[in-house]
A protein has these predicted regions:
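A structural signal for multi-pass alpha-helical bundles of membrane permease subunits
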Residues: 1-2, 6-262, 268-269
Length: 270
């Protein structure tokens, strides 16, 4: 207690009144203003924020609709071995996600299996740097996330599809409805009604999806334009991975960290 009192009123701390100065919203203005002391901070934040929202959109809705499509195809009348197809897809869920992501990341390395096969077949003359190019890296993380997420969405969609009354489909078929009309008027509205809250939480979860981005890209590709006093960022960084790199980097500049943290929605993700 004596140490706390002494530290609070020593030469570095002139009482409680001078511990800090209120600055209002000036810190947020610095984050979005190009005329701030760290001018590149606002540009870097804007680029990472736009990619984060783009990633969250594609990661959420590609998995949702493709998982639903796979469930519809497996549940379709005339499809044999339905349990087998579901079992094969579920195997990807049984393997821990971080193992799958690290393994697939190595497949697309410069010396990985994918490049080795393309070189051997003569499709390319030199190895493709998948993770060093912004476009290819962003496409890959979205596609690999689809591969990881479709089985789970397939199971969720299967359970919901089995609860849709078949009388609705039979009645609409008698009225002359096409397969597409049945999907748009019966299947999709029912799915959205049941999974609406799930879609919202999934979107927020993908904004904070640290594992997929960090384990796949491992801090690639670097960009000379995304450099701030808090450290450099990559063109595949989400806000959450950028925050992690800033706090664990050599500079440990917590100013952009506090800004970024306040912009992140809170959601638990396994």
């Amino acid at each position: 207690r004596q140490m706390c009192i002494r530290d609070s009123y020593d030469g570095a701390h002139d009482g409680y009144s001078n511990l800090f100065t209120w600055v209002g919203l000036s810190n947020f203005n610095e984050l979005i203003s190009s005329s701030s002391a760290d001018a590149n901070l606002s540009y870097t934040f804007g680029e990472i924020l736009s990619w984060t929202l783009m990633w969250a959109f594609f990661a959420t809705f590609t998995n949702y609709f493709l998982g639903m499509l796979v469930a519809i195809l497996i549940n379709k009348k005339g499809i044999h071995f339905k349990k087998l197809w579901r079992g094969i897809l579920v195997l990807t869920i049984a393997v821990p996600q971080f193992i799958s992501l690290l393994y697939v990341s190595k497949l697309f390395d410069t010396n990985g299996v994918v490049n080795a096969m393309l070189l051997k077949l003569g499709f390319i003359d030199q190895a493709i740097r998948f993770w060093e190019n912004t476009t290819s890296a962003r496409i890959l993380v979205i596609v690999i996330n689809i591969w990881v997420g479709i089985p789970y969405l397939m199971l969720v969609s299967t359970g919901i599809l089995m609860n849709i009354p078949q009388d609705l489909y039979e009645s609409s078929k008698i009225d002359g409805a096409s397969v597409w009309q049945q999907y748009m008027k019966i299947t999709l509205p029912y799915m959205l009604f049941v999974t609406g809250p799930y879609l919202l939480t999934q979107f927020i979860g993908n904004i904070n999806n640290f594992n997929v981005i960090y384990l796949l890209t491992s801090g690639r590709p670097a960009s000379p334009d995304l450099v701030t006093s808090g450290g450099s960022a990559t063109t595949t960084d989400l806000l959450i991975t950028w925050l992690f790199n800033i706090t664990t980097g050599a500079t440990s500049n917590y100013k952009p960290v506090s800004y970024t943290h306040l912009t992140l929605p809170t959601n638990s993700r396994v």
